[in-house]
Every structure is written in C-alpha cells, then in structure tokens.
Curated annotation (Swiss-Prot):
The gene is psaJ. The chain crosses the membrane at residues 7-27. SUPFAM superfamilies: Subunit IX of photosystem I reaction centre, PsaJ. May help in the organization of the PsaE and PsaF subunits. It is found in: Plastid, Chloroplast thylakoid membrane. The keyword Chloroplast applies. Keywords: Chloroplast, Membrane, Photosynthesis, Photosystem I, Plastid, Thylakoid, Transmembrane, Transmembrane helix. Belongs to the PsaJ family. One of its GO terms (cellular component) is photosystem I. It comes from the Eukaryota. It is a single-pass membrane protein. It holds the Pfam family PSI_PsaJ. Its main location: plastid. This is Photosystem I reaction center subunit IX.
C-alpha cells in the first residue's frame, strides 16, 4: 500500500487526474451553457 500511495503522488499521475478533471468540467459547463466558450 505504501508503494501505491507513492505512485499516486507522482507528477504524471497527478497531471493526468488534473487534466481529466479540468476537461470534464469544461465539457459539463459547455453542455449546460453552450455559448459561453
């Protein structure tokens, strides 16, 4: 479990999670307010 948490805190994993969150947030905003972007 220690190695798994160390793996999750590495920079590429954090970047992938952050970009996925940002992209899904933009998609949802664009779905409800399509003319804002």
């Amino acid at each position: 479990m220690k190695y798994f948490t160390t793996y999750l805190s590495t920079a590429p994993v954090v970047a992938v999670l952050w970009f996925t969150l940002t992209a899904s947030l933009l998609i949802e905003i664009n779905r409800f307010f399509p003319d804002i972007l």
